[in-house]
Amino acid sequence: MARVTVEDAVNQIGNRFDMILVAARRARQIAVQGKDPMVEEENDKPTVIALREIELGLVTADTLDADERQTVREREAAEIAAVAAIAEGRNNVI
């Protein structure tokens, strides 16, 4: 198991409390949403991977926010396309 000191991660984020929030969000993305880690997994748990990504400056609150906004935009575009396809199908039937 890799030993991770949180001091480097804290220095990247600014304070322990925000670091915990960012690490939890990123770990959830990796574990639940299936996002790919940006570092080697090395049999580490998602929380350790998230801390290592933060340490290296790969993940910040801003990058997580931007990623979530992009995901929402993609989901909305897919929904609009699906509704348009349904509406077009109804117009072709009439």
UniProtKB/Swiss-Prot annotation:
EC number: 2.7.7.6
Catalysed transformations (reactions): RNA(n) + a ribonucleoside 5'-triphosphate = RNA(n+1) + diphosphate
Enzyme class, first EC level, given as a word: transferase
GO terms for biological process, alphabetical: DNA-templated transcription
Stated family: Belongs to the RNA polymerase subunit omega family.
Protein name listed in UniProt: DNA-directed RNA polymerase subunit omega
Keywords: DNA-directed RNA polymerase, Nucleotidyltransferase, Transcription, Transferase
Pfam families: RNA_pol_Rpb6
Chain ranges passing through the membrane: none
Record's function text: Promotes RNA polymerase assembly. Latches the N- and C-terminal regions of the beta' subunit thereby facilitating its interaction with the beta and alpha subunits.
Transcription recorded as keyword: yes
GO molecular function: DNA binding; DNA-directed RNA polymerase activity
Subunit structure of this chain's protein: The RNAP catalytic core consists of 2 alpha, 1 beta, 1 beta' and 1 omega subunit. When a sigma factor is associated with the core the holoenzyme is formed, which can initiate transcription.
Protein's gene: rpoZ
SMART domains named among the record's database cross-references: RNA_pol_Rpb6
InterPro entries: DNA-dir_RNA_pol_omega, Pol_omega/Rpo6/RPB6, RPB6/omega-like_sf
Lineage per the UniProt record: Bacteria, Pseudomonadati, Pseudomonadota, Gammaproteobacteria, Alteromonadales
GO cellular component, one term: DNA-directed RNA polymerase complex
